[in-house]
Amino acid sequence: MTSRHFFYLLFWLAAQALLACHALAADTARSFAQVWRISGSVSAAVAEPAVARGLRVGDTVYVGERLQAATNGEAVLRMDDGGYLAVRPGAQFVVDDFAADQSGSDRFSLRLLQGGLRLITGWVAKLNPRGYRVSTPSATIGVRGTDHEAYFLTDTLAQTLSQKSGTYDRVVSGQTYVETRDGSVDVAPGQVGFVRAPPPPR
């Protein structure tokens, strides 16, 4: 075996080990959804430094994975409680907690880091609406059984779209509320709630 072949073999073994670690971490986590539809590039990563896997139709996605859509990427996830989550281009988010046992302890906690999602809630929001949370760097969104779109525009995204940076929540049906340390406001169908992004650290 030449030194070049040996190098390639070591590189291949290292890559396989990284993928195996990713699969092991995913296998020991709780699933929250399956990929129902997808176009372009959408990936899921377990940890930092992340080992990402490209998602395909039928793949399972897990609590704790960081999902990221490229600028050409979109996906629809069918959640384990019968709800749907549409991932918009450029979105990044993590589902930190999920339980769907059709009981009062059901819960869903999502951290939206940037970009937009559309969420059609399943039975978690119906059985335990207080256990449903979508958080961004500037606000927390709760629901009362609904179809809504949540966005967090970073400074870069806001400049690109000629909008203000911050959290946006548009309600299609049902009702949500947007909450900060200063209080909360209800958002009805056809309305958009907005909270400015926090100032950069000094």
Q: Which ranges hold each PLM region?
A:
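Bacterial N-terminal signal peptides
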Residues: 8-20
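Flexible, surface-exposed loop/linker segments and immediately adjacent secondary-structure boundaries
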Residues: 24-75, 79-200
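N-terminal secretory signal peptides that target proteins for export/translocation
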Residues: 1-6
